[in-house]
Amino acid sequence: MSHPDLNKLLELWPHIQEYQDLALKHGINDIFQDNGGKLLQVLLITGLTVLPGREGNDAVDNAGQEYELKSINIDLTKGFSTHHHMNPVIIAKYRQVPWIFAIYRGIAIEAIYRLEPKDLEFYYDKWERKWYSDGHKDINNPKIPVKYVMEHGTKIY
């Protein structure tokens, strides 16, 4: 009744569990949820620590600087997701921290870029103007193009 590949999965499972155990050590509860496996890789490469909870920034460095983290699979899309309810309150929060953008092809990491708040001001200003001109209506997940990140960011990996 089971699929022929079940034995292969069972053979791999101890290694997957080991990966999950490493993720738990770094505050990631599930490598299969919310890009947990990719998040672990980005944290280990950058030396950042995950910030718990769904609100606020995503990670912090040893000096206490917080960061917003984004990842993308460029086989599927060309723009980084931002926030499903973009508004001036969220934009003000985003203006306070650098962003780390991880670019993947499938599950293979290709590059990581860092953008400072000033590097993203073009988008902050554009979103803010749109929010006001649309009658204070939140913007649903505006994207930041991969091309923009690569042209304006500092490649750190």
From Swiss-Prot:
E.C. numbers: 3.1.21.4
Keyword Hydrolase recorded: yes
Keywords, comma-separated and alphabetical: DNA-binding, Endonuclease, Hydrolase, Magnesium, Metal-binding, Nuclease, Restriction system
Database matches in InterPro entries: PvuII_sf, Restrct_endonuc-II-like, Restrct_endonuc_II_PvuII
Recorded GO MF terms: DNA binding; metal ion binding; type II site-specific deoxyribonuclease activity
Pfam families in UniProt: Endonuc-PvuII
Binding site for Mg(2+) 2: D58
Class in the EC hierarchy, top level: hydrolase
Cofactor note: Binds 2 magnesium ions per subunit.
GO biological process, one term: DNA restriction-modification system
Disulfides per UniProt: none
Catalytic activity, as annotated: Endonucleolytic cleavage of DNA to give specific double-stranded fragments with terminal 5'-phosphates
Taxonomy, superkingdom: Bacteria
Cofactor: Mg(2+)
UniProt-annotated binding residues for Mg(2+) 1: D58, E68
CDD domains recorded: PvuII-like
Oligomer and partners: Homodimer.
Name of the protein in its database record: Type II restriction enzyme PvuII
Species, as recorded: Proteus hauseri
Lineage: Bacteria, Pseudomonadati, Pseudomonadota, Gammaproteobacteria, Enterobacterales
